[in-house]
């Protein structure tokens, strides 16, 4: 599966409450595979994934960050890796890797 195909699957199967921008980038801090930012004033979620990673790791980082994006309506949960995030991660994983 290509990275862009995974983004399209997630957009259709696990849509976010805001517009989303997904970028493969070389501009992340060292040892950071991905990040998810929320700009409420623009109603925009920006997901960045490290371009230098192998494809399978890029997909895992995308799934991880998309799960954070699913919690955009819950500010106390958005940056956590708690039970709510775990459920979102599982849903995203199943969308990208259906059994």
What residue spans do the PLM features occupy?
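Zn2+-dependent metallopeptidase catalytic core
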Residues: 1-19
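Catalytic zinc-binding patch centered on the HExxH motif and its immediate surroundings
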Residues: 17, 23-44
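Residue-level signal for threonine
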Residues: 25, 48, 82
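Short, solvent-exposed loop/turn segments at secondary-structure junctions
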Residues: 27-29, 52-53, 67, 76
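Short pre-active-site segment immediately N-terminal to the catalytic Zn-binding motif
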Residues: 43-62, 76
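Active-site recognition of the HExxH zinc-binding catalytic motif
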Residues: 60-72
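Post-HExxH zinc-binding segment in Zn-dependent metallohydrolases
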Residues: 74-99
């Amino acid at each position: 599966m290509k990275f862009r195909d995974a983004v399209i699957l997630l957009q259709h199967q696990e849509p976010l409450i805001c517009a989303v921008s997904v970028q493969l980038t070389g501009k992340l801090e060292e040892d950071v595979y991905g990040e998810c930012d929320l700009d409420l004033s623009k109603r925009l979620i920006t997901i960045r994934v490290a371009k230098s990673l192998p494809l399978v790791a890029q997909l895992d980082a995308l799934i991880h960050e998309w799960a954070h994006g699913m919690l955009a309506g819950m500010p106390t949960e958005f940056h956590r890796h708690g039970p709510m995030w775990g459920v979102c991660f599982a849903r995203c994983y199943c969308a990208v890797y259906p059994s």
